Amino acid sequence: MFFHGIFLPWVRRFGAWLFWPALAVVAWGELTPHPPRLEGPLMWDKLDHFTAYFGLTLLASLGWGLRRSLVWVFLGIVALGGVLEILQTMVGRDGEWGDFAANDLGALAGLGVAVAYLAIPRRLPADRDRV
């Protein structure tokens, strides 16, 4: 509990700083005409989208999210996913509803993890003795 209170400012800075390069990588991956593909048993297009938007939402929520603004962070990431899916059609790729759904589910999962982390009490309860 006490650990969380000490490191929350660092977690917020980390999220805010890493969001921008992560956003650039996601935008590049979605808008490049021939994105690189990894091979393997878990390499599935929808998993890529889920993971990317999970990370973006987690970083943005930890970096800038206060309880009242987390909904706006989530809606902004969802809107970003929609815009990038539309822009894909302009660079010779296919925008898909399945990709948009995977983006949204990833964003929702990232928001859930951020909310769980931010809900951890920052201080020890007053009636507990410190050891």
Name every feature range the model reports, one short phrase each.
Residues M1-F100, D104, L108-V131:
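Bulky hydrophobic segments
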